[in-house]
């Protein structure tokens, strides 16, 4: 078995929604990114790639490559799954913590878990997503962006 850790950050930018875990959430800002800015799926992808010793999302989906401009991070996550399956691994479980002062995540967590489970071909109880604030401290507390920490456990297929 293998474990991996992923971390990603995106700053807020002009827009009226963000996408987290594949779920579109109304917000006064968007997230600045080359792809769709789904910081949750980016952190999960990095955790999975790390566990399989396959590098990171920057290696597989560089922000200098125009083909990934505006890319759907769910498609990228499914590609990551193909890569780890190709190395003889399957997902045991994933766990992520969203760090954001706003918007409130609780109403969206179940939908995020369901989409992530679908994309990773696992049961929803193998996916955990939680959210916290930093009590208005730091860049997330000042509502300048969102950060996500994620871990993944891989098992031999």
Swiss-Prot record:
UniProt keyword annotation of Electron transport present: no
Cofactor: a divalent metal cation
Binding-site residues, a divalent metal cation: 8, 10, 42
Reactions accelerated catalytically: 4-CDP-2-C-methyl-D-erythritol 2-phosphate = 2-C-methyl-D-erythritol 2,4-cyclic diphosphate + CMP
A single MF term (Gene Ontology): metal ion binding
Coiled-coil region list: none
Assigned keywords, A-Z: Isoprene biosynthesis, Lyase, Metal-binding
Site (Transition state stabilizer): 34, 133
Residues holding 4-CDP-2-C-methyl-D-erythritol 2-phosphate: 8-10, 34-35, 56-58, 61-65, 100-106, 132-135, 139, 142
Pathway annotation from the record: Isoprenoid biosynthesis; isopentenyl diphosphate biosynthesis via DXP pathway; isopentenyl diphosphate from 1-deoxy-D-xylulose 5-phosphate: step 4/6
Gene Ontology BP terms: isopentenyl diphosphate biosynthetic process, methylerythritol 4-phosphate pathway; terpenoid biosynthetic process
EC number: 4.6.1.12
CDD domains in UniProt: MECDP_synthase
Free-text remark on how the cofactor is bound: Binds 1 divalent metal cation per subunit.
Pfam family, one: YgbB
Protein purpose: Involved in the biosynthesis of isopentenyl diphosphate (IPP) and dimethylallyl diphosphate (DMAPP), two major building blocks of isoprenoid compounds. Catalyzes the conversion of 4-diphosphocytidyl-2-C-methyl-D-erythritol 2-phosphate (CDP-ME2P) to 2-C-methyl-D-erythritol 2,4-cyclodiphosphate (ME-CPP) with a corresponding release of cytidine 5-monophosphate (CMP).
Subunit structure: Homotrimer.
Annotated family: Belongs to the IspF family.
Protein name: 2-C-methyl-D-erythritol 2,4-cyclodiphosphate synthase
Gene for this chain: ispF
